[in-house]
Amino acid sequence: MDFISRAIALFWIVILSPFFLLIVICSLLIQGRPILFKQKRVGKDFQLFNIFKFRTLSIKNNNNLFIRPNIIKISKWGRFLRNTKLDETPQLFNILFGNMRFIGPRPEIPEYVVNEKFDFLKELKPGLSGYSSIIFRNELEIMSLLKNKDPYDDILKIKIALDKYYQFNKSFIVDLKLVAITLLSLFMPRITGHY
């Protein structure tokens, strides 16, 4: 499966390369450098790796995705990239490098990872999509409704439960279903409740 994931990632990198170039040019013209956002995340067996995204935040906020949504500054271009999930497409390279899979738990920053709660990482590689990615597709909007000191902490508890559910129910068929739901949420969001 790992070889197949890498091969599919390479295929899509080649197919999408013109779009990558277009996004890079638009990002340079609209936001300037840096084009990519890079951050340490925790992978399988608690190994750290750099996750890649197209930058959507202001330079001031660029190193911290988990501050309160009302003080995050996202440009109109950045919001477009987020809403269409185009900001996530550089993670195809993470899959190609073997850090991630297409389906699995979303990789967290080290500060949020407590080993005993994330024991599924002994078995699973992080994924580009999965149960928590689909349910929390509009994560910033959900966080803005939570009034406690660390709104992401509430979301993280649910994500961990979803990741453990995936751990005990994973199969090739489940992965195919999650890929299909992910594509539906991108191209027909009203069907999956994402607006």
Could you describe each region identified by the protein language model?
Residues 70-131, 179:
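A short, structured surface patch at a secondary-structure boundary
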Residues 23, 38, 66, 103-105, ...:
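Short, hydrophobic secondary-structure boundary micro-motifs
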Residues 125-195:
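C-terminal terminal-structure detector
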